[in-house]
Amino acid sequence: MKRFSKFINTSLIALALLLASCGEDRTGEFIAKTEVDHWIEAQMQDIYLWYNEIPKLETSYYFYPADEFFPMLLSSNDKFSYIEMLDQETASAGTKSIHINSTTYGIEFVLTNDPTQTTSHQYARILYVLKNSPAARAGLKRGDWITTINSKNLTQDNYGLLETGNGVTVTIAPIILTEQTASWGEATEIQIQAAEAMENNPFLVSEIITSPQSGKKIGYLVYNEFVTGKTPNDPTDTSYLEEMKTVFQNFKNEGVDDFILDLRYNNGGYIQCAQAMATMLAPASSLNGEFAHLVHNDKRQDLNYTYMFDSNYSSENLNLSKLYVISGVYTASSSELIINSLRPYMDVKLLGVQTVGKNVAATQINSPYNFIMYPITATVYNKDNQSDYANGFTPDYTINELNYLNWAELGDTKELLLYNTLHLIEYGSAPDAENSESSGGEEGGDEGTTKAVKHYKSRQALQISYSSISQKTRPAIIATQY
């Protein structure tokens, strides 16, 4: 940090002398008002992956608030660096108090345009509901369409009312299809009671499915965030890593033959979580090998690091030869790292839609100024030096759940993506895949995977926006605390 102090002081002294030469000496005032932005710039000049693309800014920009100044420094190649502002109460308590509990109604949703194309309104479709949450007690469930909030249409400005508050009234309505039309059915009004502080456990569903055809035991895990513990900004809290060991030990005790890792709603988190999970999924013969390595900018090659499979998790290893991964439009960073890092060792089949494409790592930089920075600091490679997924991974079997009308609950074997993955394991094909020879054939049991008819127009869910209960704003692999 001495190097940074020297940089800041030299810059400030030069500018202060200029101010003093104009008459009144306002050096102290200038230093105080620009100190924060100079601190940010110093950090970025040192560790940022694209430090040589940081622009030279005019003096006036150093008076901007931190959350406005930080984006000015970013490269045009950078889609993922961000800054998280903390309120005074949170900052004074230290980072360990951040997001311990989420005060929420307990619904994760996606915003979309009107799938019937009969209005210009937006609608929210529920992706899942947290157990024992206010939304669950109100009777909301996965797949429900929310048409209004407090008797008002949903917009980009008011959808936050679905996340938290002292209670909210929503209406839900089904979509009625005929051979020629799609229309909204009769609406039902539902009152959700006040939001509650809830633990958002990343292990949403953990099940063992026994195939009625072959008798195979198939492990199924819906994992929603690579977070070490109940305090996401504190990697020293490892409570969820310990729970991960318990979850996989159960899979091992049951002798699972195949494994389905559902990452459709997981957009990343800490690399040590991905390292731990990969250790438990990989073939046992690979456990002395490399998991991934990070390459930093040319000034900070000292930070380059190779992650091996973690021996602390080897006793829970399932010794798999093949892994089935379910992906969605939010599957990113550490989720993609799992795919990329395991492919040199085993057959990884991807079913779902194109992933986001985050082959870079961020570093968490805690500041003394009530914010945390997450700049991109490294490119992530697997053991074969491959990192060519900046545009995302294309699935082996493409199925977009947003194109379908009827959704079963996650973990239900009739649920679209799970059904197709189970069919792939048993019969070698995914019936509903757009890029499969069997596309358009058998569908997933009863109404669980009934396709929307051709006139059902929500085949692109526009203006997608997640609620905040799973902290979907975290955009990249979090490598280290700095």
Question: Language-model features: where?
Answer:
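Short strand-turn motif at the edge of the Rossmann-like AdoMet-binding core
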Residues: 264
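Bacterial N-terminal signal peptides that target proteins for export
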Residues: 1-11
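C-terminal motif of bacterial Sec signal peptides marking the signal peptidase cleavage site
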Residues: 18-21
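C-terminal "post-core" interaction segments
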Residues: 221, 225-236, 251-258, 267-482
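Conserved aromatic-histidine-acidic binding/catalytic patches
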Residues: 10, 28, 330
